[in-house]
């Protein structure tokens, strides 16, 4: 019952915050909970969902290359500006943080609750996008390790 109340609260916050992505995600999870015998699916979705999401995002990022909107000239142009180098560096940093984030989420499940709360606040209150829990977990890992803190 507690999970239903929690999901209902998330749904209300998403509706109040006009966040369609969070509304859709919450409704999908609620529908999955209603379907008989999905108890074994939910851990699979939890475990593999991040990888599936990364795959979908990667497909969306590659579409402009496939349609010819972005070509080799654009790639070379990116290396001619400081902003391009910063973008490459941030891409590398995010990939590294994500690696630590996935490990952190697996090793310390308690961090998930705090990240979910922070993500919901960021999405609803600041009109952010719920695309960064793994990165946030990686950043958490780095700061917690640097400050020698523990959950």
From Swiss-Prot:
Membrane-topology annotation of the record: Multi-pass membrane protein
InterPro entries named in the record: UPF0756_TM
Alphabetical keyword list: Cell membrane, Membrane, Transmembrane, Transmembrane helix
Stored Pfam families: DUF441
Domain of life, per lineage: Bacteria
A cellular-component GO term for this protein: plasma membrane
Chief localization: membrane
Ranges that cross the membrane: 4-24, 52-72, 77-97, 115-135
Keyword Transmembrane helix annotated: yes
Location of the protein in the cell: Cell membrane
Stated family: Belongs to the UPF0756 family.
Full protein name: UPF0756 membrane protein Lreu_0946
Organism: Limosilactobacillus reuteri (strain DSM 20016)
């Amino acid at each position: 019952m507690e999970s239903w109340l929690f999901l209902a609260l998330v749904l209300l916050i998403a509706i109040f915050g006009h966040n369609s992505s969070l509304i859709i995600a919450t409704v999908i999870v609620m529908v999955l909970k209603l379907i008989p015998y999905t108890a074994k699916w939910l851990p699979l979705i939890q475990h593999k969902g991040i990888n599936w999401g990364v795959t979908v995002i990667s497909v969306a990022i590659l579409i402009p290359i496939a349609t010819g909107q972005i070509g080799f000239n654009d790639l070379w142009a990116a290396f001619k500006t400081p902003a391009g180098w910063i973008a490459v560096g941030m891409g590398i940093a995010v990939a590294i943080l994500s690696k630590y984030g996935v490990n952190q989420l697996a090793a310390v499940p308690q961090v998930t609750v705090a990240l979910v709360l922070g993500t919901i606040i960021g999405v609803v209150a600041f009109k952010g996008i719920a695309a960064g829990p793994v990165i946030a977990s990686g950043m958490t890992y780095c700061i917690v390790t640097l400050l020698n803190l523990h959950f």
